[in-house]
Amino acid sequence: MVQLNQNFIDTITQELPAHLSMDEFIAACDKPLRRSIRVNTLKISSDDFKTLMQPKGWTFDPIPWCEDGFWISYDEEEQLGNALEHIQGLFYIQEASSMLPPTALFTPSAFTTSAKWQCVLDLASAPGSKTTQMAALMQNQGLLVANEYSASRVKVLHANVLRMGASHCALTHFDGRVFGEYLYESFDAVLIDAPCGGEGTVRKDADALKHWSLDDVLAISETQKALIESAFLALKPGGSLVYSTCTLNRLENQGVCEYLKQVYGDAVQFESLSDLFDGADRATTAEGFLHVWPQIYDSEGFFVAKLTKTASVPRLLPEPKLQKNFPFTTASAKQAQGIKDYFQQDLGISLPDELIMVRDDEFWLFPHEFNAFIGRMRFQRIGIKLADNSKHGFKVRHEAIIALAGKQLSPTAKTVDVSDVEAKEYLMGRDIPLATAGKAQGEVIVCYGGAPLGMAKHLGNKLKNNLPRDLVKDKVLLLPEQTKSL
């Protein structure tokens, strides 16, 4: 049974729109959430994913605001996070409402001028659902800076970015309030899914509101004001900003947006989201924001606001000095050609036309747009590591295969397609015997369902597992195919 604090009920009763009832709100909060996932189109199309999963008993109900998002139902009660297709990065387990902010930011107009969306910031990224959704919307083009303040959550963010094959991300670990100072007017678009009171999450956490207090709401709203101001300062003139929370009170939502408008006046232009998707008007406020109450779409509660920065605004602090000792250098023409030839000739992968960088004996792939950020801020991780160079030649890195071996593969690529049982064995770190012995082929890409799992060494009679030890799984769930009754 959901625990609703009486102080919360008293406060929210005054803010609930007239066309909604408190009884319906409480009833919605007591219902379990519908399961929802987002297909990772960096690796597989939604149609192909449905074709893959429907024989396993999955049914798909489209989420109206996300083209690749679905409410799903299936017979199994196992943890989906252990499913082979999830480990492989074919889908992300993501609550439907949390798909709204990237959709609001990347409206169709965002794609009409490609130059408009070269540098995007996700100010509070972990665990990575919205970051990887934006990476898919950007099709791994341009630069996506993903920031997370919590050190432990940065590790989770990095793991999800790699699993989903997002190759154009640069990860940072800072308090989001410093971005306006360090990266002033540097981004074409900014998403800030702000830390909040979490009032909208009560359907998955029955105790989320047990200790609710107005003092806590007031305190966190001050942090949110500082974050949205920092995000606004980091936004280029003409750029778009989306502010979102998974909470319901006005102080953390409309109040934060109104604060920004009070400080920066006409430089802040609110954009209506009433036409974002069919039925959006049911949750649209007078300002054009989306205030999603749980009973409207049978989802988590959520708030989404979009604004345009119409003019440059003064920076609050002097520009910081450039940082020195950046550990990467641009690869020479000879080095760049060497690594390109290795990927093309040995692996059948055409490297994207991006920056090839070198650090010691490591080769990395950076987005071209990252050049403008060198020395301006410390980054935890940039792009993807392609390979190590040793006296025996190049040794490809797992993350490069996961990110690049999908749509970049040539017909001559050395791949081995495996069954679901063999894929499970591979992900558990085991070698895979080959049914028919043949000539050893050296390094090969192991694939399941048309998407890569990683590398192996073809020894003629078996595939020697080259999966990094830290990625070996103790449990991999194979979702069984459903038999149709006559």
Curated annotation (Swiss-Prot):
GO molecular function (one): rRNA (cytosine-C5-)-methyltransferase activity
Keywords noted in UniProt: Cytoplasm, Methyltransferase, RNA-binding, rRNA processing, S-adenosyl-L-methionine, Transferase
GO cellular component, one term: cytoplasm
Localization (cell): Cytoplasm
GO biological process, one term: rRNA base methylation
Secretion signal span: none
Keyword Transferase annotated: yes
Enzyme nomenclature, EC number: 2.1.1.178
PANTHER family: 28S RRNA (CYTOSINE(4447)-C(5))-METHYLTRANSFERASE-RELATED (PTHR22807:SF30), NOP2 YEAST -RELATED NOL1/NOP2/FMU SUN DOMAIN-CONTAINING (PTHR22807)
Highest rank taxon of the organism: Bacteria
Protein name: Ribosomal RNA small subunit methyltransferase F
Protein family membership: Belongs to the class I-like SAM-binding methyltransferase superfamily. RsmB/NOP family.
NCBIfam families: nop2p, PRK11933.1
Residues reported in the UniProt entry to bind S-adenosyl-L-methionine: A124, S125, A126, P127, G128, S129, K130, E148, D175, D193
SUPFAM superfamilies the record matches: S-adenosyl-L-methionine-dependent methyltransferases
Function summary: Specifically methylates the cytosine at position 1407 (m5C1407) of 16S rRNA.
UniProt-annotated catalytic positions: C246
Gene3D superfamilies linked to this entry: 3.10.450.720, Vaccinia Virus protein VP39
Principal localisation: cytoplasm
Pfam families: Methyltr_RsmB-F, Methyltr_RsmF_N, Methyltranf_PUA, YebU_pre-PUA_dom
Catalytic activity line of the entry: cytidine(1407) in 16S rRNA + S-adenosyl-L-methionine = 5-methylcytidine(1407) in 16S rRNA + S-adenosyl-L-homocysteine + H(+)
